[in-house]
């Protein structure tokens, strides 16, 4: 009865309301006069009183509050004045800065400037949390890769640049474009880092969750005493690692000068759109991600490799006037394995061309018959390690030996055919697998774009190549080894939508 009384909100002496409703007046009076002597109910009634959070010692409340997400703490402060006072304890906010944003600096030095850890969390980290991660600037066809990170007591936007052409295996370069901090005042300070005269006044506007813009308020800091010529020479040395006199190819000189004129006009006043790293699956051919690739006279560019069922795609993160950033530069059909001939025959461009064009003809026939409209998702890329797909010719002689070598894990000898140009001659001489693919080519200004056949060459987990048949050119790609935080797509659908969005901007 005591348990029922608790649920009904009355004491045991008065009994259960529901039972009283079923009794008559005489029964109710008799029941009220009886003593409730059930020992089990007595033990329940005599249980310990509940403890309120308000009765806990302050140091325990600090520990509890510090373990909660920082976004929940403002609501907690509205409960009572005691909670509000405790939430001013810097220990709580120091832990939230460390656990949520990785700030491992000794935040005690902030006391000198009168800035608390609570200020750092609320006015810097939380306020600008939406700009952390990877972004692509809107710089016409050139694009770019910006990584916004928490760096100590700063939020810094680092522009990632490919290594100097043609050293595709070298690490990425990076330079700061802006920073935000609270070191000198209690409101966040945005500074432009562009140019060579040090930090100066800037502004950041968060347009929406996946878009923000930067503005420099002192563009005179970007100018150099020697005028545009000095600015160009400095930019060329940073961008290409050489002088204009070192570049003998006239067309390449024109492309370089065009890029300088186009990009310098923005003066670090840019709009950025969020990009995600591609999701990874166990059956992917290799780990997807960002790669540096050689693109002839355009130098090195950044490409994102992603897997979509039976196909792999390379999307440009940086671009050029022919194929702008955001476009799909290569597409690989993982169901159409190409067996290369032996090394001697591989040197013959016509032999390789014959093999690739036979596969293209097979693709065309299947598309006309309606069979290639919706290719099945299986077998997966990993399954391609088995026998090669039918390519119109049965491999024989040296090709069989090469196939056995590749399937045994030793790899297959690889050499570029005579007449095929490559910006980097230091490519691997052994490959694991080859697939049929297409590459996107176009005229200046992205005119008359078309997809042309080629060969995707997988060397290892971190390197692949693409042989452009029509251009008689070879692009070598090397993985970007940097680690990026806050760059994972919330879902595969969000990643696909991101690809569509950046492609539509330059289509």
From Swiss-Prot:
Residues 50-96 form the F-box domain. Residues 400-412 have a biased composition (Low complexity). Keywords: Cell cycle, Cytoplasm, Cytoskeleton, DNA damage, Metal-binding, Phosphoprotein, Ubl conjugation, Ubl conjugation pathway, Zinc. Phosphorylation at Ser-264 by ATM following gamma-irradiation results in its stabilization. Phosphorylation at Ser-448 in absence of stress promotes its ubiquitination and degradation by the SCF(FBXO46) complex. Phosphorylation at Ser-33 by AKT1 promotes association with CDC20 and ubiquitination by the APC/C complex. Part of a SCF (SKP1-cullin-F-box) protein ligase complex SCF(FBXO31) composed of CUL1, SKP1, RBX1 and FBXO31. Interacts (when phosphorylated at Ser-33) with CDC20, promoting ubiquitination by the APC/C complex. The modification Phosphothreonine is found at residue 37. Pfam families: Cyclin_D1_bind, F-box-like. Zinc-binding is required for the structure of the protein and facilitate folding. Pathway: Protein modification; protein ubiquitination. GO terms for molecular function: cyclin binding; ubiquitin-like ligase-substrate adaptor activity. It is found in: Cytoplasm; Cytoplasm, Cytoskeleton, Microtubule organizing center, Centrosome. It comes from the Eukaryota. GO terms for biological process: anaphase-promoting complex-dependent catabolic process; cellular response to oxidative stress; DNA damage response; mitotic G1 DNA damage checkpoint signaling; proteasome-mediated ubiquitin-dependent protein catabolic process; protein ubiquitination; SCF-dependent proteasomal ubiquitin-dependent protein catabolic process. It comes from Mus musculus (Mouse). The modification Phosphoserine is found at residues 33, 264, 448. Substrate-recognition component of the SCF(FBXO31) protein ligase complex, which specifically mediates the ubiquitination of proteins amidated at their C-terminus in response to oxidative stress, leading to their degradation by the proteasome. FBXO31 specifically recognizes and binds C-terminal peptides bearing an amide: C-terminal amidation in response to oxidative stress takes place following protein fragmentation. This is F-box only protein 31. The keyword Ribosomal protein does not apply. The gene is Fbxo31. Zn(2+) binds at residues 192, 200, 216, 222. Belongs to the FBXO31 family. Residues 33-42 have a biased composition (Acidic residues).
């Amino acid at each position: 009865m005591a348990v029922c009384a608790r649920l009904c909100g009355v004491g045991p002496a008065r009994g259960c309301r529901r039972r009283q409703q079923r009794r008559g007046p005489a029964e109710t009076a008799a029941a009220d006069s009886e003593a409730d002597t059930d020992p089990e109910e007595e033990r329940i009634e005599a249980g310990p009183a509940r403890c309120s959070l308000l009765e806990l010692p302050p140091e325990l409340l600090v520990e509890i509050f510090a373990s909660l997400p920082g976004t929940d703490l403002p609501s907690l402060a509205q409960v009572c004045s005691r909670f509000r006072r405790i939430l001013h304890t810097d220990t709580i906010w120091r832990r939230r800065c460390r656990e949520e944003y990785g700030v491992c600096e000794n935040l005690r030095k902030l006391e000198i400037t009168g800035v608390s850890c609570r200020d750092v969390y609320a006015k810097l980290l939380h306020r600008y949390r939406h700009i952390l991660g990877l972004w692509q600037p809107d710089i016409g066809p050139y694009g770019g890769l910006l990584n916004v990170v928490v760096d100590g007591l700063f939020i810094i936007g680092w522009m990632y640049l490919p290594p100097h052409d043609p050293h595709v295996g070298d690490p990425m370069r990076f330079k700061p474009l802006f920073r935000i901090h609270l070191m000198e005042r209690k409101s966040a300070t945005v500074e432009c880092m562009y140019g060579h005269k040090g930090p100066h006044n800037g502004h950041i506007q968060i347009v929406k969750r996946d878009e923000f813009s930067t503005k420099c308020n002192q563009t005179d800091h970007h100018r150099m005493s020697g005028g545009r010529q000095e600015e160009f020479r400095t930019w060329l040395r940073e961008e290409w690692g050489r002088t204009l006199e070192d570049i003998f190819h006239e067309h390449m000189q024109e492309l370089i000068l065009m890029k300088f004129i186009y990009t310098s006009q923005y003066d670090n006043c840019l709009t950025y759109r969020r990009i995600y790293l591609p999701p990874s699956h166990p059956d992917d051919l290799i780990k997807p991600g960002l790669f540096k690739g050689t693109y002839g006279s355009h130098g090195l560019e950044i490409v994102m490799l992603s897997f979509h069922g039976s196909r792999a795609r390379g999307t440009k993160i940086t671009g050029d006037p022919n194929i702008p950033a955001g476009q799909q530069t290569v597409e690989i059909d993982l169901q159409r394995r190409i067996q290369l001939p032996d090394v001697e025959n591989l040197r013959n461009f016509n032999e390789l061309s014959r093999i690739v064009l036979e596969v293209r003809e097979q693709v065309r026939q299947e598309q006309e018959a309606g069979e290639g409209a919706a290719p099945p998702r299986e077998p997966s890329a990993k399954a391609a390690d088995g026998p090669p797909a039918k390519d119109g010719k049965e491999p024989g002689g040296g090709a069989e030996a090469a196939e056995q070598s590749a399937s045994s894990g030793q790899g297959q000898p690889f050499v570029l055919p005579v007449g095929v140009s490559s910006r980097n001659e230091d490519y691997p001489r052994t490959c694991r697998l080859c697939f049929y693919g297409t590459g996107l080519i176009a005229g200046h200004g992205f005119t008359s774009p078309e997809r042309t056949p080629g060969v995707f060459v997988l060397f290892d987990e971190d390197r692949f190549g693409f042989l452009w048949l029509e251009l008689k050119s070879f692009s070598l790609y090397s993985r970007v080894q940097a680690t990026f935080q806050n760059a994972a797509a919330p879902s595969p659908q969000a990643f696909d939508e991101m690809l569509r969005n950046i492609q539509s901007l330059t289509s």
